[in-house]
């Protein structure tokens, strides 16, 4: 009876995903995309994008396929200029291997200076490599804030896309939480009515 009453009450109390950095630099001033008004998985594959095929495959399989039906969910990969051909090849290869529609994967080219500026605005303890890339991806909420974990193990700013364990043990749950928060906010504001 108690379990029934709990679920029937319709009140869900869950831990919210902490904001680790407010106001990540919005890219709308330097590109046609934005980090606002959508839940964004933000990444930096770098000039050596062909070395990130495994990372992209892990993200596609474990995150994108699970959540891509959510209309306000996107992947944004910030890329150095002159990498469009490499990004297009990655998408073609991923389409061929996975039969996935990558319409919500956006590859945005920008100058090295702008790319580093966006990365630095995350204010993490992580660094870009010499090719202006990292295997880490980040969750940005619809207000443009970096979300992650801050617990007894310390702050977790990003998720290492090289390792399925990090994605499955941490990122999947965190994306579920941020999407649940978003749905609750929509419901509270009567967006569904």
Model-predicted regions and their roles:
Residues 36, 70-73, 132-135:
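Extracytoplasmic
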Residues 133-193:
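Thiol-/selenol-based redox modules, centered on thioredoxin-like
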Residues 111-133:
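Surface-exposed short loop/turn segments
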Residues 32-59, 73-76:
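Short active-site neighborhood of thiol/selenol oxidoreductases, capturing the structured segment around
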Residues 55-107, 112-118:
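Structural microenvironment flanking redox-active thiols in thiol-disulfide oxidoreductases
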Residues 47-52, 81-85, 146:
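Short acidic, S/G/P-rich loop/turn micro-motifs used as interaction or catalytic elements
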Residues 63-67, 122, 126, 175, ...:
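Sec/Tat-exported extracytoplasmic proteins
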Residues 1-28:
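N-terminal targeting signals for export/organelle localization
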């Amino acid at each position: 009876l108690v379990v029934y009453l709990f679920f029937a009450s319709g009140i869900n109390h869950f831990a919210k995903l902490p904001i680790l950095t407010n106001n990540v630099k919005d890219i709308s001033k330097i590109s046609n995309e934005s980090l606002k008004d959508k839940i964004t998985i933000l990444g930096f594959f770098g000039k050596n994008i062909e070395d990130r095929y495994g990372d992209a495959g892990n993200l596609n399989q474990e995150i994108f396929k699970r959540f891509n039906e959510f209309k306000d969910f996107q992947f944004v990969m910030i890329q150095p200029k002159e990498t469009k051909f490499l990004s297009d090849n990655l998408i073609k290869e991923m389409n061929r291997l996975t039969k996935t529609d990558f319409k919500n994967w956006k590859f945005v080219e920008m100058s090295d200076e702008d790319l580093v500026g966006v990365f630095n605005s995350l204010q993490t303890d992580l660094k870009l490599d010499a090719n202006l890339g990292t295997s880490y991806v980040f969750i940005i909420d619809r207000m443009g804030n970096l979300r992650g974990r801050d617990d007894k193990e310390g702050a977790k700013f990003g998720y290492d896309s090289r390792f399925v364990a990090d994605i499955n043990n941490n990122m999947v749950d965190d994306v579920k939480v941020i999407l649940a928060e978003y749905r609750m906010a929509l419901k509270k504001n009567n967006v569904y009515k």
